[in-house]
């Protein structure tokens, strides 16, 4: 890398906070795939020994209601990434990780579409400005007409 970083720095970001028991317990608390506390009584979740078919961490349950991984739908502020200049887009964690992944994919597709549109616009503007020149470097006529 040109700025003095190594390849390992590009692959694995640095974490500036130290990993403590408090951090570990917070991480474990907010990354469990538990159901919401209000739905735990009616739902046979992991606490009751049952599993939800087709639901990994976040996503719609069998009745179609989204179940966030964090209790009460609160995002963990410690999960936010601080990646400096390596990340062009800041990703918020206002909803669960599944939504974030979908937004990441959508952002990538939107970027691709934007690049395609830009290429088309450039091609159109270039073809409109092509003019035929004779040997004396004078513009004779517009090729589009």
Curated annotation (Swiss-Prot):
Tissue: Predominantly expressed in the brain (at protein level). Within the brain, found in most of forebrain structures, including the cerebral cortex, hippocampal formation, olfactory bulb, anterior olfactory nuclei, piriform cortex, tenia tecta and amygdaloid nuclei. Not detected in glial cells.
Superkingdom per UniProt: Eukaryota
Post-translational modification: Palmitoylation and myristoylation target the protein to the lipid rafts.
Intrachain S-S bonds: none
Subunit structure comment from the entry: Interacts with CAMK2A.
Known role: May play a synaptic role at the postsynaptic lipid rafts possibly through interaction with CAMK2A.
Name of the protein this chain belongs to: Brain and acute leukemia cytoplasmic protein
């Amino acid at each position: 890398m040109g700025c003095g970083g190594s390849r390992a720095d590009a692959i694995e970001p640095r974490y500036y906070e130290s990993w403590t028991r408090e951090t570990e317990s917070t991480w474990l608390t907010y990354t469990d795939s538990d159901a919401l506390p209000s739905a735990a009584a009616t739902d046979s979740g992991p606490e009751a020994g049952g599993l939800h078919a087709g639901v990994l961490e976040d996503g719609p349950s069998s009745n179609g209601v989204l179940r966030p991984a964090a209790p009460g739908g609160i995002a963990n502020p410690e999960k936010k990434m601080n990646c400096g200049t390596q990340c062009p887009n800041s990703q918020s964690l206002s909803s669960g990780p599944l939504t974030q992944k979908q937004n990441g994919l959508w952002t990538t597709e939107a970027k691709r579409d934007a690049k395609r549109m830009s290429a088309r616009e450039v091609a159109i503007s270039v073809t409109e400005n092509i003019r035929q020149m004779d040997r004396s470097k004078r513009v004779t006529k517009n090729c589009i007409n």
